[in-house]
Amino acid sequence: MRHVRAMERIEAKKAENRWSLRQPKKARGPGVPKSHWDYMLEEMEWMRTDFAEERRWKVVEAREFAYQVVEWHLASPEEKKALMVGGRGWGECRNVPIPGHAGKRKEVTVEVEAEDEDVEMLVGQEGELDGEGEANKVLESIDEMRVNEKERENRPEDPRETVNINQDIGEEVDAEGEADADGEPENGEADAEGEADADGGPVGDDVVGLSEIDAAQDDTRETSERPSYRRDTVLPNGLVIHKRFANAYEIAIARGPVLDTPLANATVDLDTLTKSSSAATPATVPAEPSVSPDEPASFDQLFPDLAMYSGPAPPENDKKYRRDEGGTYSHRMAHTSRIMDIRPILVSTLQPAKNLIDGEWDLHDGPYYEEVKGAADIPPNVVAAFNTPFGGKASRPLEHMRVPEVPKPAAHHLRAQLLWSPEEDKCLLKLVAMYPFNWDLIADSFNTEMILIPVEKRNPYECWERWYYTFGEGKNKPRQDAPPSAPPPAPASATQPGTATATPVPQSAVTTPGVPPSANLPSASGRPQQTGGNSVSSLPTPTGEALPDGAPPPPGMSKRDRMAAKPKYEGTKRSVRHQAIYDAVKRMNRRREAARAKSHKDNAQRKVINVHESHSMSFPHVAASTPWELVEAKYQRDVQIAQQRQQRAMQEQQRQLAIRQQQAMMSAQQQAQMRPPNMPNVPNMPNAQPIRMGPNGQPMPTMAPSQQQLLNAVAAATAANRQNANGAVQGNPNVRPMPVVQGQSPQVQQQMLLQAQQMAAQQARVLQAQAQAQAQQGRAPSMGGNLQPPQLGVSSPFAQSRTPDLPAEGAGPSGINPTPSPAMQAAAIGAQSSPQIATMGRAPSNNVPPHLRVPNAGTSSPQISSPMALPQGIPNGAGMPVQGAQTQGIQIPAAMMNNATVQQLLATLAASGQQMTPEQLRGLMLRSAHMQAQAQSQVGNPGTPQMGVQNIQGVQHFARSPSLQNAQSQPRSSPKPGPANGQGT
């Protein structure tokens, strides 16, 4: 199936003129020694073939035997006798006479020739004989003939038998005792016995007779006039006909019976082909005597166009390492084209520069020389009728060949017509005789021999046209492109006017006098004729009609050749020139654009240099960094590395401190559980908190300040310090603090808590005395009324927000504001450290009397918590007295802050990603201690239960009656000191 598909593709390419008919010469490669495996494979192939043929032969034999057995069983007894060996029936052997038995035998006296004729007649009429008598007669005559032959062989030679044999051959013999006629020589025939010669002399043993003389004359005549015997004939297509056959017609007749043999026959008897070959038309030149007409022809003689498949050829001359490439066992079996039937030779292998002299090839000494014996004398119809069995279809006669497509050379109207010289015509005729109708090879050889200029090369169609209309069947016929009234084409030797030598006139140049050349062009193809322009007559156009009595045209051109031969410009000279200039300009523009793009691309590629990454620049348009920038970058990198190292060390310390803090907290919890629940704190103890009494005189539980307010204040102060360090504008009230971020690790909180406790322990005692002194100073009267010491006004959730620079809006007519708790005062001091703290948690407030503003110490929302106002005696931005003492070098002990408050403060700062310095923490603790001291000084004389505890500072109170509210809202001075002002005596 693969072979069939491959052959179909080859035929399709042939139809499209895409299959090359010129096969290159097979190159001889180096010798490949055969291995043991190669021999095994070859023997395997032959064994496979033998087994297949043997099986086929056995099947055929079994079939023939079966037919004969059935025929014998269906035959009559007489027919069975004829079918059996010896011609005797079943059991007839008993009737055969025994040799030596005295039986009655009938003598048959007939001559040898007559006996042969009788036997032939009887053998041919065996089926028509009736009765056993006739059959017995035939058998007896055959037996007698055999006996006579044996006796003749045993006895000496008899002259009479010699005469009878000569009679069988057909020679004339004189009668016994009869003289020769006219005494003429008998050409070797023997005279009668006892007859004298013509000259009357006796004939002896030592006398040379006339027969010897005549024989010598015959030998001399044969030597002098020896006829020329027929040799092998080479056909135009390269096939070599054996000398047995005179022409291809005899081969076709001789192998006809072989091709007509039915497929059921497994073998072919070549002996039966002898009579058929001898019955062919006798040739004028006899074959050599060595070729006997009775000898059957071999298959290679009957089929010279086929490759014989033989077995592996053994190496000759002990050349074991060279494979015989000429052997038939490795021949190609696929018949792709007729070129495989011949041995094509490329013109380049003939070396025309050395072997072509004056138009004659000197190739008589080369290995590729083959004498052309009558190749040009064979009629073309014989060559065309001869076809190989692999062709698949009978070749069509030449009359049915269609006119090929006319090639269109480039710029055909601008090209002058080619003229054929007598030398070129002679070379064309020689090539046509050498390569009959192979126009591709003819054109190639012609261009190699004659043409030296590439412009004047001939294509196959031009060669065919020149031969057909000058020397072929179309010599005396009008051309297809000539008008009916045009004269016949001029011969090749026609002389043009104005030239001294005979120059052939091109067929297309013959025109009608007085008519322009363009007017003589017929529109056979249906295209409009050109009315003007520099154009010449074109070649014949394919019409699809049969070319009568024409030679085979050249093969069609390939698609590439047709595209190359297509004219690029058409029209007048001016239009052609304009088109050419326009195309040249476009080509120039395209070249410029391509060159520009290529140069730009090359320049872009040159900028990219494969160097080390330390030498490359990520941003080509950015200037290189200065030394200062490089040093700064290195410093920042070192700072980051140091911070990372410090952070890792702090994490390790936090882990250790967390363990210690956890143990301390557990011990503190155990002590708190062991203390009685109603046991009050001792007021004289340094760490004891002031006791707050309720309305009924019972001590109230100590209320811790709002931890969230303290945390917000510390976070806002830290954010403000950071913004000031980064170059922010100081005192901008619109800057809001950063939000507090939750989620800091507990290790950081524990570390900050321990640091706060250590610093608070150093300032435990000093703030107690400082608070008492400030309490005494705050009771001094001022401006004709009882003035309170500097206090921090804390507004209720309804109080209007304000900045620390403004006075408190909640103050009464006398400027006295309600005093908050110490925890609230500490929060107000923390808010004073930064102007941004005052903007936190501003809630709208109507003008509510101060006695109705209830401080909320338990909320943690920044909107509900109230901002703390600065004392009136301290300017904005100024430090507290404690801070002034510190600046003067006085060591002030601070009161211990609540552990939970400090821990919450540090946790809030750590959650916001801020690191609090010891100075900030120390200042915060001092402010908290100062507020606690102020709270304790205000609780010096809480008053009596009858007067109420509404003036107790730092305690949550609620209005219970309108009279009490009025008393609180408008305090008035009295000449008598009393508990109305909230001061005890």
Swiss-Prot record:
The keyword Transcription regulation applies. Residues 169-198 have a biased composition (Acidic residues). Residues 520-541, 793-803, 932-954, 962-973 have a biased composition (Polar residues). Residues 143-161, 218-230, 558-573 have a biased composition (Basic and acidic residues). GO terms for cellular component: NuA4 histone acetyltransferase complex; nucleus. Residues 124-230, 275-295, 475-575, 773-813, 932-985 are annotated as: Disordered. Residues 412-471 form the Myb-like domain. Its main location: nucleus. GO terms for biological process: chromatin organization; DNA repair. Residues 24-100 form the HSA domain. Pfam families: HSA (PF07529), Myb_DNA-bind_6 (PF13921). Component of the NuA4 histone acetyltransferase complex which is involved in transcriptional activation of selected genes principally by acetylation of nucleosomal histone H4 and H2A. The NuA4 complex is also involved in DNA repair. Belongs to the EAF1 family. PANTHER family: E1A-BINDING PROTEIN P400 (PTHR46459:SF1), E1A-BINDING PROTEIN P400-RELATED (PTHR46459). Component of the NuA4 histone acetyltransferase complex. This is Chromatin modification-related protein EAF1.
